């Protein structure tokens, strides 16, 4: 294993907040601790994946002359990475046209690393169908709101669960902890074997393999995995993220006819209807699959590792 060091730091609130009064003290504390970590650990390279947590350490590393890399996962970078761009050696990106935000000469297109089990999921379709007890000849919809679930997505699915039964659609529904009991009760009442809810799905490789249509938030890593899978996707960006970067991520796919998008605020009314219409449109399914597959990057982890090794030679 490896040691985890925490910093007393948090993001700066865009609107007025008393929490902002603590920000200068948190920043100074984190810079001092980062300096101590670098002095003690003596790194040959420092990599930051963005956000306020990596800012102080990358800043101190660059001041000490330690080679530093930012891995920007989103299509729209946050303030921290924009500020760090001036001092780091290279910036790994997963989207095109990032020279709008960063110095072009520092950009390296690597994509985002995805989980090994997802890379090995393509030949597990039958295993996935059996595992989730799905009807063989029905389209399977996988709904994933992230590990904590997503209230609006859950409410949309729950309020229109009868549509899945009516339209003979299989459903694999990850709810998160807070919606687990309500979803279980609804699934029990509808009483269809191909419609199942789960607090958390450990076997995501099997869920992805079994799915024909996927409903997901638009986080950077999730999108990278969806590009690899090459299946029709309906994205519901979370509104509760800095810089609204999930909407930017989703829009970049929509612009390439690679995904459909439903705004979070509209999802209670429009999400299930969007799923239903997509399930009935084979041509659109094929177009979305074909286009999103063009965006996959299988070897992102290797690209980042190769760059890292070059910088420490």
Model-identified regions with their sequence ranges:
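Active-site-proximal region of nucleotide-activated glycan assembly enzymes
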Residues: 2-3, 62-123, 134
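Glycosyltransferases and closely related glycan-assembly transferases
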Residues: 35-47, 53-69, 82-87
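A short, well-ordered alpha-helix in the C-terminal region of glycosyltransferases
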Residues: 130, 284-298
């Amino acid at each position: 294993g490896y040691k985890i060091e925490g910093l007393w730091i948090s993001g700066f609130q865009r609107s007025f907040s008393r929490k902002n009064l603590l920000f200068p003290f948190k920043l100074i504390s984190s810079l001092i601790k980062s300096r101590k970590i670098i002095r003690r650990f003596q790194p040959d390279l420092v990599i930051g994946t963005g956000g306020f947590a990596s800012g102080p350490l990358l800043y101190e590393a660059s001041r000490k002359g330690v080679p530093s890399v930012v891995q920007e996962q989103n299509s729209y970078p946050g303030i921290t990475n924009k500020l760090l761009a001036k001092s780091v050696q290279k910036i790994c990106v997963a989207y095109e046209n990032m020279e709008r935000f960063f110095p072009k000469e520092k950009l390296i297109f690597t994509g985002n690393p995805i989980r090994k089990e997802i890379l090995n999921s393509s030949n597990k379709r039958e295993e996935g169908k059996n595992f989730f007890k799905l009807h063989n000849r029905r389209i399977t919809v996988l709904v994933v709101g992230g590990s904590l679930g997503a209230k609006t997505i859950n409410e949309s699915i729950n309020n229109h669960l009868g549509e899945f039964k009516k339209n003979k659609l299989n459903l694999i529904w990850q709810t998160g902890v807070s919606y687990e009991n309500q979803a279980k009760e609804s699934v029990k009442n509808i009483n269809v074997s191909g419609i199942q809810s789960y607090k958390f799905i450990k076997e995501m490789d099997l869920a992805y393999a079994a799915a024909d249509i996927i409903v997901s938030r638009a986080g950077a890593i999730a999108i990278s995995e969806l590009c690899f899978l090459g299946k029709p996707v309906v994205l519901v960006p979370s509104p509760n993220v800095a810089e609204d970067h999930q909407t930017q991520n989703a829009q970049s796919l929509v612009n390439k006819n690679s995904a459909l998008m439903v705004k979070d605020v509209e999802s209670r009314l429009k999400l299930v209807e969007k799923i239903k219409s997509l399930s009935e449109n084979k041509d659109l399914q094929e177009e979305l699959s074909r286009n999103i597959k063009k965006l996959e990057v299988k070897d992102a982890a290797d690209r980042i590792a190769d760059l890292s090794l070059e910088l420490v030679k």
